Swiss-Prot record:
PROSITE patterns given in the database record: RIBOSOMAL_L14
SUBUNIT field: Part of the 50S ribosomal subunit. Forms a cluster with proteins L3 and L19. In the 70S ribosome, L14 and L19 interact and together make contacts with the 16S rRNA in bridges B5 and B8.
Keywords: Ribonucleoprotein, Ribosomal protein, RNA-binding, rRNA-binding
NCBIfam families: rplN_bact
The family this protein is said to belong to: Belongs to the universal ribosomal protein uL14 family.
Protein name listed in UniProt: Large ribosomal subunit protein uL14
One of the record's GO cellular component terms: cytosolic large ribosomal subunit
GO terms for biological process, alphabetical: translation
Function description: Binds to 23S rRNA. Forms part of two intersubunit bridges in the 70S ribosome.
A Pfam family reported for this protein in Swiss-Prot or TrEMBL: Ribosomal_L14
Underlying gene: rplN
Origin superkingdom: Bacteria
Gene Ontology MF annotations: large ribosomal subunit rRNA binding; structural constituent of ribosome
Amino acid sequence: MIQMQSTLDVACNSGARRVQCIKVLGGSHRRYAGIGDIIKVSVKEAIPRAKAKKGDVYNAVVVRTKKGVRRPDGSVIRFDRNAAVLLNNNLQPIGTRIFGPVTRELRNEQFMKIVSLAPEVL
């Protein structure tokens, strides 16, 4: 469950390392975002000479949460850290590589590009 002020790791090679959620998109008073949801983020920590600079604002899709996601068979997939992938205005990933596993729930949305780039799909 990601809400405003939550900090997340970045799971792509866009250059950002840590981002902070500044808005959960979808609905006027929507409070929480889960895996597969789009959020607005601000870059808090970035590597030098990268595409994403500190202070930049991007859209991002949540790919891993500590809360996890419940499957129809009753199993729950949880992760140790919260992570997101930065997106451009067309909701395409900025980076060309994805680090760490992602869940199958991203396949249902418009994020097949992220699923195909990920090293492991749970």
